[in-house]
Amino acid sequence: MMLSCSPLTVPSSSYPFHFLPSSSDPPYDSIRNHPSLSLLHNCKTLQSLRIIHAQMIKIGLHNTNYALSKLIEFCILSPHFEGLPYAISVFKTIQEPNLLIWNTMFRGHALSSDPVSALKLYVCMISLGLLPNSYTFPFVLKSCAKSKAFKEGQQIHGHVLKLGCDLDLYVHTSLISMYVQNGRLEDAHKVFDKSPHRDVVSYTALIKGYASRGYIENAQKLFDEIPVKDVVSWNAMISGYAETGNYKEALELFKDMMKTNVRPDESTMVTVVSACAQSGSIELGRQVHLWIDDHGFGSNLKIVNALIDLYSKCGELETACGLFERLPYKDVISWNTLIGGYTHMNLYKEALLLFQEMLRSGETPNDVTMLSILPACAHLGAIDIGRWIHVYIDKRLKGVTNASSLRTSLIDMYAKCGDIEAAHQVFNSILHKSLSSWNAMIFGFAMHGRADASFDLFSRMRKIGIQPDDITFVGLLSACSHSGMLDLGRHIFRTMTQDYKMTPKLEHYGCMIDLLGHSGLFKEAEEMINMMEMEPDGVIWCSLLKACKMHGNVELGESFAENLIKIEPENPGSYVLLSNIYASAGRWNEVAKTRALLNDKGMKKVPGCSSIEIDSVVHEFIIGDKFHPRNREIYGMLEEMEVLLEKAGFVPDTSEVLQEMEEEWKEGALRHHSEKLAIAFGLISTKPGTKLTIVKNLRVCRNCHEATKLISKIYKREIIARDRTRFHHFRDGVCSCNDYW
């Protein structure tokens, strides 16, 4: 809003007042020490406040400005309830409020969620002929800063100059902060330069402005000029470095601070511990932790939360859990930090269990909680819990700052849990779609083999003027890769590099090389590797190894495996892939040698693990698993499945199982793969016709793929399986991947 008046000459206000008879205040001491006012100190409810106010009216204190100012001040500062509306109602009854009362009201409005109301009140006051003073301007300027009311702030600056308040340090600092928060750093610096009395507070206000906008050198220059630095100025500079990603510089500055006589406070330690977490400086973090304990900060909740985050991010979850468990009181940030730590370390099941414990504790989750837990639901395929979170978000978290990110996370969760239609519904419900939302939906369709839908979205994006980024093109190339669309993949790669002038990243090359390898174009794939500006990673070499197995190219497979082992010597997957290539070619001696080499190095193949969610509980199975409470029923269903599969003509392909095993044992090894155990459990745990969704940590093998196609037809079930790379939708004996994966 604009102050629709010239400075200090405002039209009469329509602000509604209900006047009480005026009277002069009785002697000051008799009011200040009155028992009724002392009751405010113990007031914790709005009902109690009304009773105290009624008593004040009964004994005549309602006509004294001092008593009313204390009542209004209590209302606006009460930590127990929202008292501003009551303060406004009291204010409207005062016939001639003095400047103290006006300033108290400005303070309340400035602290509220509607700071513009302070500006409206300011217009009202000067229209009544009252002049603001140096106590008025800091609150009104704070409102201009919070509401980004730059024009109004300029006008009030004029009032400051006219009334000669510009020399007041508080007003001076408030002007700097107002300009800073409105992004007017040049104006802020002009105010700073004109001040004959620069104190550490005004320096700090300007330092924060420069640092928050990335002008860290300007901030450092000002910081160096401060003659006597206090803890606030040190904090401003340290947090300035941290917030701009200069964590090492932040920590070096903290070390400099420790050489002075300035004692760090809560804000310092939270910033420093967070900088250690972000930079992975665990050793320095431990030293800081010792200092915290030695100097009496060990029970500070904010600092302990920061320490939990430090140890979580640095992989020391046992220490993080210990800190969490020892907290006498845990706030929502405590819970969020540890849940986020579990998610960060890929301990998704532990994250879900902690989330459920949080709900049982009575703590109310917020948007940050949901952004931490939705990836866990997505990874585990825990769609029932994901749906509950969706309902919670719709009911409790509408309009939060992270609303767009929450919707994008829901799209990702539904897509990764197998319900691509639900993901699409969430996408369509977003009125103002961010690029992240478009990308999440493109990726969702891609992983479900819906390349056509991915490209339809891309066309819609371009029509409405949304520019794709490098992530968009990873999604599109991934869609081509999952569907074997080589020509379209080449076209998209050219579009990205030529039309959008984007430099390909490792992920883009990975998709193209996977496409070329699947198509048997190994020479072209190697040429692309040679033209890359970066070294290929393990994902690229793995995709080529799988392609060699598919096309029976043992010689190239050996070469690619050698490259993979060089960059990932401790990865057993490279030996397993090479062993599979030898097995496909019937070279059993090489299979035995490769497996022996794997054993000699003490490495073990990552076991296949599949999970299925039943009634909001995620059940996990490994190959040959016999530890489930319903183990007997599961294996009974497995036997039934095998009988029906055999009747349907299914014959297991045992060519890739070690030669030394008897044929009967080979078939048994295939029969007990983790995805089959999960399917068997799903069949005995759900009603006929219920859709089953399986999540597997490895690529589904050819035998299980063929068997699952038939199982979907025999039991008349839709079975959705997510393996390491994509989704398979099995229905009526057919898979959505068309046997291309």
Swiss-Prot record:
<feature type="repeat" description="PPR 11">
    <location>
        <begin position="434"/>
        <end position="468"/>
    </location>
</feature>
<dbReference type="InterPro" id="IPR011990">
    <property type="entry name" value="TPR-like_helical_dom_sf"/>
</dbReference>
<comment type="subunit">
    <text>Interacts with ORRM1. Interacts with VAR3/OZ1.</text>
</comment>
<comment type="similarity">
    <text>Belongs to the PPR family. PCMP-H subfamily.</text>
</comment>
<dbReference type="Pfam" id="PF14432">
    <property type="entry name" value="DYW_deaminase"/>
</dbReference>
<keyword id="KW-0677">Repeat</keyword>
<dbReference type="Pfam" id="PF12854">
    <property type="entry name" value="PPR_1"/>
</dbReference>
<feature type="repeat" description="PPR 3">
    <location>
        <begin position="168"/>
        <end position="202"/>
    </location>
</feature>
<dbReference type="GO" id="GO:0003723">
    <property type="term" value="F:RNA binding"/>
</dbReference>
<protein>
    <recommendedName>
        <fullName>Pentatricopeptide repeat-containing protein At1g08070, chloroplastic</fullName>
    </recommendedName>
</protein>
<feature type="repeat" description="PPR 4">
    <location>
        <begin position="203"/>
        <end position="229"/>
    </location>
</feature>
<dbReference type="Pfam" id="PF20431">
    <property type="entry name" value="E_motif"/>
</dbReference>
<comment type="function">
    <text>Involved in multiple sites RNA editing events in chloroplasts. Involved in the editing of the site 9 of ndhB (ndhB-9) and site 1 of ndhG (ndhG-1) transcripts, which are two plastid-encoded subunits of the chloroplast NAD(P)H dehydrogenase (NDH) complex. Not essential for the activity of the NDH complex of the photosynthetic electron transport chain.</text>
</comment>
<feature type="region of interest" description="Type DYW motif">
    <location>
        <begin position="647"/>
        <end position="741"/>
    </location>
</feature>
<feature type="repeat" description="PPR 10">
    <location>
        <begin position="403"/>
        <end position="433"/>
    </location>
</feature>
<dbReference type="GO" id="GO:0031425">
    <property type="term" value="P:chloroplast RNA processing"/>
</dbReference>
<feature type="repeat" description="PPR 7">
    <location>
        <begin position="300"/>
        <end position="330"/>
    </location>
</feature>
<dbReference type="GO" id="GO:0009451">
    <property type="term" value="P:RNA modification"/>
</dbReference>
<feature type="repeat" description="PPR 12">
    <location>
        <begin position="469"/>
        <end position="499"/>
    </location>
</feature>
<feature type="repeat" description="PPR 9">
    <location>
        <begin position="366"/>
        <end position="396"/>
    </location>
</feature>
<feature type="region of interest" description="Type E(+) motif">
    <location>
        <begin position="616"/>
        <end position="646"/>
    </location>
</feature>
<feature type="repeat" description="PPR 13">
    <location>
        <begin position="505"/>
        <end position="535"/>
    </location>
</feature>
<feature type="repeat" description="PPR 1">
    <location>
        <begin position="98"/>
        <end position="132"/>
    </location>
</feature>
<feature type="region of interest" description="Type E motif">
    <location>
        <begin position="540"/>
        <end position="615"/>
    </location>
</feature>
<dbReference type="InterPro" id="IPR002885">
    <property type="entry name" value="Pentatricopeptide_rpt"/>
</dbReference>
<feature type="repeat" description="PPR 2">
    <location>
        <begin position="133"/>
        <end position="167"/>
    </location>
</feature>
<dbReference type="GO" id="GO:0008270">
    <property type="term" value="F:zinc ion binding"/>
</dbReference>
<dbReference type="InterPro" id="IPR032867">
    <property type="entry name" value="DYW_dom"/>
</dbReference>
<dbReference type="InterPro" id="IPR046848">
    <property type="entry name" value="E_motif"/>
</dbReference>
<dbReference type="GO" id="GO:0006397">
    <property type="term" value="P:mRNA processing"/>
</dbReference>
<dbReference type="GO" id="GO:0009507">
    <property type="term" value="C:chloroplast"/>
</dbReference>
<dbReference type="Pfam" id="PF01535">
    <property type="entry name" value="PPR"/>
</dbReference>
<keyword id="KW-0507">mRNA processing</keyword>
<keyword id="KW-0809">Transit peptide</keyword>
<keyword id="KW-0934">Plastid</keyword>
<dbReference type="InterPro" id="IPR046960">
    <property type="entry name" value="PPR_At4g14850-like_plant"/>
</dbReference>
<feature type="repeat" description="PPR 8">
    <location>
        <begin position="331"/>
        <end position="365"/>
    </location>
</feature>
<keyword id="KW-0150">Chloroplast</keyword>
<feature type="repeat" description="PPR 6">
    <location>
        <begin position="265"/>
        <end position="299"/>
    </location>
</feature>
<feature type="repeat" description="PPR 5">
    <location>
        <begin position="230"/>
        <end position="264"/>
    </location>
</feature>
<dbReference type="Pfam" id="PF13041">
    <property type="entry name" value="PPR_2"/>
</dbReference>
